């Protein structure tokens, strides 16, 4: 039995680095344990099949033309363009994926002063899905939303979608074995069935 303490389950991804260091040499089966503040102490939640979603990221920059705030007619205002994108992006992604993914815009940045329209505006976020086809559909829908708004306003854009890890899908046989073992340790009454969720983990 080998205990492994993995860092960075999202974003940079600690699992691959540990594998490359040889941590899984001569290992037949790996079982992950994730701390959950919503689970009561002494209880274990477990689920076979789909459990954690793929945690993809996206980032975009809208490239317009700055101007003095008193002369907006001389600008290609990236903030106005970004506002339109943010208004449409959720409904476009939901429509393209039939409401089967979670997409959240988590950061928005633009401007430095109160009287100057900036040249650029940027935003980024995450897409969570249990299906690789839906991941691609979300990617396309996000870029199409950006492209449409920028072309209409005469702006340019840069866009990057980062495909991180596939969904975490637990093996049924290993899950059943884990449940039997856990029952001996904490009692059958303390083994709960977990719900699949949109968190991510590269385990």
Q: Where on the chain are the PLM-derived regions?
A:
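Metal-dependent amide/peptide-bond hydrolase catalytic core
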Residues: 80-203
């Amino acid at each position: 039995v080998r205990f492994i303490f993995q860092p960075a389950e999202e974003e940079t991804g600690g699992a691959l680095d540990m594998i490359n260091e040889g941590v899984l040499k001569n290992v037949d089966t790996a079982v992950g344990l994730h701390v959950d503040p919503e689970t009561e102490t002494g209880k274990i939640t477990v689920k076979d099949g789909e459990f954690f979603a793929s945690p993809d990221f996206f980032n975009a920059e809208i490239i317009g033309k700055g101007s003095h705030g008193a002369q907006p007619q001389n600008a290609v205002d990236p903030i106005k363009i970004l506002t339109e994108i943010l208004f449409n992006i959720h409904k476009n992604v939901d429509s393209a994926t039939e409401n089967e993914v979670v997409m959240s815009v988590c950061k928005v940045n633009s401007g430095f002063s109160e009287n100057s329209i900036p040249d650029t505006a940027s935003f980024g976020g995450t897409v969570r899905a249990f299906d690789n086809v839906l991941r691609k559909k979300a990617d396309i829908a996000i870029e199409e939303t950006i492209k449409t708004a920028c072309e209409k306003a005469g702006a340019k854009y840069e866009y990057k979608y980062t495909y991180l890890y596939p969904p975490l899908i637990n093996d049924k046989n290993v899950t059943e074995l884990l449940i039997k073992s856990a029952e001996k340790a904490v009692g059958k009454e303390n083994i709960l069935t977990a719900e699949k969720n949109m968190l991510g983990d590269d385990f």
